[in-house]
Amino acid sequence: MRSDMIKKGDQQAPARSLLHATGALDKPTDMNKPFVAICNSYIDIVPGHVHLRELADIAKEAIREAGAIPFEFDTIGVDDGIAMGHIGMRYSLPSREIIADAAETVINAHWFDGVFYIPNCDKITPGMLLASVRTNVPAIFCSGGPMKAGLSSEGKALTLSSMFEAVGAFKDGSISKDEFLDMEQNACPTCGSCSGMFTANSMNCLMEVLGLALPYNGTALAVSDQRREMIREAAFKLVDNIKNDLKPKDIVTREAIDDAFALDMAMGGSTNTVLHTLAIANEAGIDYDLTRINEIAKKTPYLSKIAPSSSYSMHDVHEAGGVPAIINELFKKEGTLHPDRITATGKTLRENNEDKEILNSDVIRHLDNPYDKQGGLSILYGNIAPKGAVIKVGGVDPSIKVFKGKAICFDSHDEAVEAIDNHDVREGHVVVIRYEGPKGGPGMPEMLAPTSSIVGRGLGKDVALITDGRFSGATRGIAVGHISPEAAAGGPIGLINDGDEITIDLTNRTLDVNVSTEELDARKQNVKPFKAKVKTGYLARYTALVTSANTGGIMQVPENLI
């Protein structure tokens, strides 16, 4: 066993003394059992994580029953909704790397035989996934699950995105103070990840099709008995995987990445999933080109439209058959998925999901009646984004295929929000927010406040927004993000001037400023070199090492320093 490194032989007697001091070993023969890390992410201020200590206790008990010894440790976590719109959002994406590095450190320092990961919210799941692939120790994931959907006192369905859009509506006088406060009190009624198809739930659904989590991981409610039974089942599966030496890199293959994007397309997932999945592919040593995503989109139908793109919540999806029903429906279209891949259950993707039927065809549609014949995400290319940009087409009004507008440019998120609040942004504008990418932000903050304000003011079909930053999964409207290269890396988004005509063509997947190449080259001569905004601490180190979004916003040490 891997853990023999710290517990076998006379030279490890001091280590064994310390292990006995933990109280985790009831008898001497426990030293002969697999040591299993529980990588938890319990934190009081994140509603998606407040219940994870209870789930970890269930996992510990089950791991012992399965014949192994559990040891729990925690990582950090950032709540994107609480961190939104201020310096906290600069730390959100960078926290993914801290989580990955911290888990790698504990796992490798203590030679665990397997790892049970308990994530839930936005950056925690991908951070742990990066660690699992990097350490390549037998692993399984069981997230904390989504919260129940909110209901206003009048019975209107609510999610966190409803609350963000309500801010714009309240400022605009469209809703009353009483309505505003009622929404605030009722939008998030229980523990769990936010109830729509936002980043957390998108990633937790993708874990099912990647094969590192059990069926229904993405949709079973945080407060449900099913979630607790899933924890127990996953613990037993993990101990089996340790015995069988089934590792993350056996599961996370190029075909698994393809299938993750296919499910993403079928569910209209968050644009952040593109960023995280590309980072995971890189960690697994898979050279994954962005153009591959569009090819997957073209053959994958959009089957389930979930909040913020509709009023349906994750619980509605669960009641309609969950991710297994969507996967099984996609099996019926040959070439969409790779059903014979091995997963952490010890079975293939097909064996996990076959015969799981759709129980409500309003929530999950059949192949012959999709929301769209193509997937809910698109990669756009053009002279603004030569290395790609991402749009959640499933969140755009279906009547919009091409949008042309005049640029109104801002070099920060805050400047854009102020302009929108002051009614400087009007119908026919394309809001350009730049120097907010991974390096420029730093940290590639989410542009949820400006997009929500635009939609909340009733301009969702009349104003577009493009940025080298990113979006919350709660974003909807004509919102193009992840523009690469970013402005701070010399990307052409930094060359756009107020009044330039911009064309967003969703049919042909293009993003262009209607300015000649010669004019853009001339403008380039006047651009001043980017200077890092943060000079000390973690964000300074992050700025120095991070790449643009087209490679997943990963931290890379320059080759000349290796």
UniProtKB/Swiss-Prot annotation:
Binds 1 [2Fe-2S] cluster per subunit. This cluster acts as a Lewis acid cofactor. This is Dihydroxy-acid dehydratase 1. NCBIfam families: ilvD, PRK00911.1. The gene is ilvD1. PANTHER family: D-XYLONATE DEHYDRATASE, D-XYLONATE DEHYDRATASE YAGF-RELATED. It is an enzyme of class 4 (lyase). GO terms for molecular function: 2 iron, 2 sulfur cluster binding; dihydroxy-acid dehydratase activity; magnesium ion binding. Belongs to the IlvD/Edd family. The keyword Signal does not apply. Homodimer. Its cofactor is [2Fe-2S] cluster; Mg(2+). Functions in the biosynthesis of branched-chain amino acids. Catalyzes the dehydration of (2R,3R)-2,3-dihydroxy-3-methylpentanoate (2,3-dihydroxy-3-methylvalerate) into 2-oxo-3-methylpentanoate (2-oxo-3-methylvalerate) and of (2R)-2,3-dihydroxy-3-methylbutanoate (2,3-dihydroxyisovalerate) into 2-oxo-3-methylbutanoate (2-oxoisovalerate), the penultimate precursor to L-isoleucine and L-valine, respectively. The keyword Amino-acid biosynthesis applies. Its EC number is 4.2.1.9. It comes from the Bacteria. It catalyses: (2R)-2,3-dihydroxy-3-methylbutanoate = 3-methyl-2-oxobutanoate + H2O; (2R,3R)-2,3-dihydroxy-3-methylpentanoate = (S)-3-methyl-2-oxopentanoate + H2O. The active site is at 472 (proton acceptor). It comes from Staphylococcus saprophyticus subsp. saprophyticus (strain ATCC 15305 / DSM 20229 / NCIMB 8711 / NCTC 7292 / S-41). Pfam families: ILV_EDD_C, ILVD_EDD_N. SUPFAM superfamilies: IlvD/EDD N-terminal domain-like, LeuD/IlvD-like. Pathway: Amino-acid biosynthesis; L-isoleucine biosynthesis; L-isoleucine from 2-oxobutanoate: step 3/4; Amino-acid biosynthesis; L-valine biosynthesis; L-valine from pyruvate: step 3/4.
